[in-house]
């Protein structure tokens, strides 16, 4: 029964994260946004380091963008529509440092999402992550840019 409650909590958190709109940011100018939620405390995960990489022609990962989540658990302004061209990208969320800052020893070093972007034309991507010390879930919301 406890596992069912945990599953429902995780699903509810994913719905919350994926449905919530950006806070005070013009979504039409944000082609890549990351949202991070702390499932243990039921709150935004603040000050979480996020690194974005782009796969190069030689199959290596080149640094593309980085930043930290805000008080709302969101990270905007990672790139522009002009820079965010078709390709394979990796979003790496530093979960270990986040949990260590709260005095918790986590299992994972980081959460990672690898995806193909803009292969069907320009799109806007919201990568959402729901974190706990021993697990994480991710989802993506992909939309057409607003004119």
From Swiss-Prot:
Residues 1-20 form the signal peptide. One of its GO terms (molecular function) is thyroid hormone binding. It holds the Pfam family Transthyretin. The keyword Signal applies. Coiled coil: none annotated. Gene3D superfamilies: Transthyretin/hydroxyisourate hydrolase domain. Glycans are attached at residue 118. GO terms for cellular component: extracellular space. SUPFAM superfamilies: Transthyretin (synonym: prealbumin). It is found in: Secreted. Sulfonation of the reactive cysteine Cys-30 enhances the stability of the native conformation of TTR, avoiding misassembly of the protein leading to amyloid formation. The modification Phosphoserine is found at residue 72. Keywords: Glycoprotein, Hormone, Phosphoprotein, Secreted, Signal, Sulfation, Thyroid hormone, Transport. One of its GO terms (biological process) is purine nucleobase metabolic process. The modification Sulfocysteine is found at residue 30. L-thyroxine binds at residues 35, 74, 137. Homotetramer. Dimer of dimers. In the homotetramer, subunits assemble around a central channel that can accommodate two ligand molecules. Interacts with RBP4. Belongs to the transthyretin family. PANTHER family: TRANSTHYRETIN, URICASE AND TRANSTHYRETIN-RELATED. Thyroid hormone-binding protein. Probably transports thyroxine from the bloodstream to the brain. This is Transthyretin. It comes from Macaca fascicularis (Crab-eating macaque). The gene is TTR.
């Amino acid at each position: 029964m406890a596992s069912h409650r945990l599953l429902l909590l995780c699903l509810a958190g994913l719905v919350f994260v994926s449905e919530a709109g950006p806070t005070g940011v013009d979504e039409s100018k944000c082609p890549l946004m990351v949202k991070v939620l702390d499932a243990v405390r039921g709150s935004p995960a603040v000050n979480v380091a996020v690194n974005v990489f782009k796969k190069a022609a030689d199959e290596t990962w080149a640094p593309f963008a980085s930043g930290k989540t805000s008080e709302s658990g969101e990270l905007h302004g990672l790139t522009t529509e002009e820079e965010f061209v078709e390709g394979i990208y990796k979003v790496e969320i530093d979960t270990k440092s986040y949990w260590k800052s709260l005095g918790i020893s986590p299992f994972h070093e980081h959460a990672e999402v690898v995806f193909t972007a803009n292969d069907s034309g320009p799109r806007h991507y919201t990568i959402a992550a729901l974190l706990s010390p021993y697990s994480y879930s991710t989802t993506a919301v992909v939309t057409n840019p607003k004119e």
